[in-house]
A protein has these predicted regions:
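Solvent-exposed, amphipathic alpha-helical segments
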Residues: 15, 19-26, 72-80, 111-115, ...
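Hydrophobic/aromatic-rich alpha-helical bundle segments in the mid-to-C-terminal region
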Residues: 126-130, 147-209
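Amphipathic alpha-helical packing segments from all-alpha helical-bundle domains
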Residues: 71-72, 102-113, 123-149, 190-193
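Short loop-to-helix capping motifs
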Residues: 54, 118-123
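Helix-turn-helix
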Residues: 12-15, 19-57, 61
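N-terminal intrinsically disordered/low-complexity leader segments
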Residues: 1-11, 204-209
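Short, basic, alpha-helical segments at the C-terminal edge of helix-turn-helix-like DNA-binding modules
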Residues: 34, 64-71
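Hydrophobic alpha-helical connector segments
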Residues: 61, 74-109, 160-165, 189
Length: 209
């Protein structure tokens, strides 16, 4: 590991990152070759090493940036929705959870798994995703805090672990491999609402009896 960080030209650095991302889009994470990135960016491989130390260093930045964009795009969508709503039903709130049928999000969902798998062998990427995940978990708690006052009174008392633990960890890794026994989004939301509402009503009744 170099003892001194190489700053270099920000424009060149961004060009290398852009070309690396294009390579990953075309050939996947495993197919990323520094020689191809260098050719596209019209720089030398040794220069890439100066900026990113090695292939893992380049991957850590490119995939870390992608993961951050993925997380914050989702957060911005939810924040905007919560802020714009004066009242929220439990059914509407449940729509924000990950769903079995990813639709247009399927590609991102699959790529996210690849990024997480890469992070297991890439300490720099692992540290960045860990920090983003800790921040996202804290954000999810504040999002719940903002939603609860807008729900009907009897639906406000659910066990928060439905969202902070179960749904936070839901990725449908094995579900996507099934050919049968699949559930559509409407059925899933109905099932989720039933569980959360039952929890809320049980806690609500216990506090008022």
């Amino acid at each position: 590991m170099p003892s001194k960080k190489f700053n270099g030209d920000p424009t060149t650095r961004e060009l290398i990152l852009k070309c690396a991302r294009t390579e990953i889009d075309q050939y996947g994470i495993i197919g990323l070759r520094l020689s191809s990135v260098a050719e596209k960016a019209q720089v030398s491989v040794p220069l890439i090493y100066k900026y990113f130390e090695d292939r893992d260093g380049l991957l850590a930045v490119v995939l870390g940036d992608w993961y951050e964009e993925f997380v914050f795009r989702y957060r911005a969508m939810i924040d905007g929705w919560i802020d714009s709503a004066s009242r929220i039903t439990l059914e509407e709130f449940a729509q924000l959870s990950p769903k079995p049928q990813a639709g247009a999000m399927q590609k991102d969902r699959e790529f996210r798994l690849q990024v997480l798998a890469t992070a297991l062998e890439n300490p720099q990427l692992h540290r960045r995703i860990k920090a983003l995940t800790i921040d996202a978990h804290a954000w999810s708690a504040t999002a719940i805090d903002r939603v609860i006052p807008k729900l009907p009174e009897s639906d406000r008392h659910f066990d928060r672990r439905f969202f902070s633990l179960l749904l936070f960890n839901t990725m449908y890794v094995f579900y996507d491999l099934l050919d049968t026994e699949r559930i559509d989004d409407e059925q899933y939301i109905s099932f989720l609402v039933h569980l959360v509402r039952a929890s809320s009503h049980e806690n609500f009744n216990a506090r008022n009896n």
